[in-house]
Amino acid sequence: MQNITDGSFGFDTDILATNLINLSAVLGVLIFFGKGVLSDLLDNRKQRILRTIRNSEELRETAIEQLEKARARLRKVEMEADRFRVNGYAEIEREKLNLINSIYTSLEQFENDKNKTIHFEQQRAINQVQQSVLQQALQGALGTLNSCLNNELHLRTIGATIGMFGSMKAKK
């Protein structure tokens, strides 16, 4: 396009030309029409930012509530764990004492059984010695009797013994 007034100050119909009046007019039109759009864009952006802030605040409050609930549950679980730990230790101590008492009772029983076995073996050894001594004494007495007794003395001893048995039988 050609300027109508070459070399003078005027309005240029070429909107892409860079004179001050054209720029002012373009800026004025942009500001007039763009003001509403820009204002709407800024208001929308402001509303989105405010909504995001409110949502963030709500999420933060929800997170704080959940954190408090989690802390309360943690305290409760820790208290239960402490209670179980204390009860567990008490149960372990009880079981330990029961085991010690059981072992002590078993040891006492083993000691008693050992003493009974020793006493039994001593009695058996004493009985064996007594039987051996008695048998040797009887063999010695029998040997003495056999060497001392003659036939007549033997018959008199048998007769006296039979008489004793006869009188014992008569008394019953």
UniProtKB/Swiss-Prot annotation:
Pfam families the record matches: ATP-synt_B (PF00430)
Gene Ontology molecular function, alphabetical: ATP binding; proton-transporting ATP synthase activity, rotational mechanism
| The entry's keywords | ATP synthesis, ATP-binding, CF(0), Chloroplast, Hydrogen ion transport, Ion transport, Membrane, Nucleotide-binding, Plastid, Thylakoid, Transmembrane, Transmembrane helix, Transport
This protein's membrane topology, according to the annotation, is: Single-pass membrane protein
Q: Name one GO cellular component term.
A: chloroplast thylakoid membrane
**What InterPro entries does the annotation carry?**
ATP_synth_b/b'su_bac/chlpt
Regions that span the bilayer: 15-37
**Chief location bin:** plastid
Cellular location of this protein? Answer: Plastid, Chloroplast thylakoid membrane
Q: Which HAMAP family match?
A: ATP_synth_b_bprime (MF_01398)
Provide the function of this protein: F(1)F(0) ATP synthase produces ATP from ADP in the presence of a proton or sodium gradient. F-type ATPases consist of two structural domains, F(1) containing the extramembraneous catalytic core and F(0) containing the membrane proton channel, linked together by a central stalk and a peripheral stalk. During catalysis, ATP synthesis in the catalytic domain of F(1) is coupled via a rotary mechanism of the central stalk subunits to proton translocation. Component of the F(0) channel, it forms part of the peripheral stalk, linking F(1) to F(0).
The record's annotation in PANTHER family points to: ATP SYNTHASE SUBUNIT B, CHLOROPLASTIC
Miscellaneous comment: In plastids the F-type ATPase is also known as CF(1)CF(0).
Q: Summarize the subunit comment.
A: F-type ATPases have 2 components, F(1) - the catalytic core - and F(0) - the membrane proton channel. F(1) has five subunits: alpha(3), beta(3), gamma(1), delta(1), epsilon(1). F(0) has four main subunits: a(1), b(1), b'(1) and c(10-14). The alpha and beta chains form an alternating ring which encloses part of the gamma chain. F(1) is attached to F(0) by a central stalk formed by the gamma and epsilon chains, while a peripheral stalk is formed by the delta, b and b' chains.
Family label: Belongs to the ATPase B chain family.
Query: What's this protein's name?
Result: ATP synthase subunit b, chloroplastic
Species annotation: Pisum sativum
Q: Which gene encodes it?
A: atpF
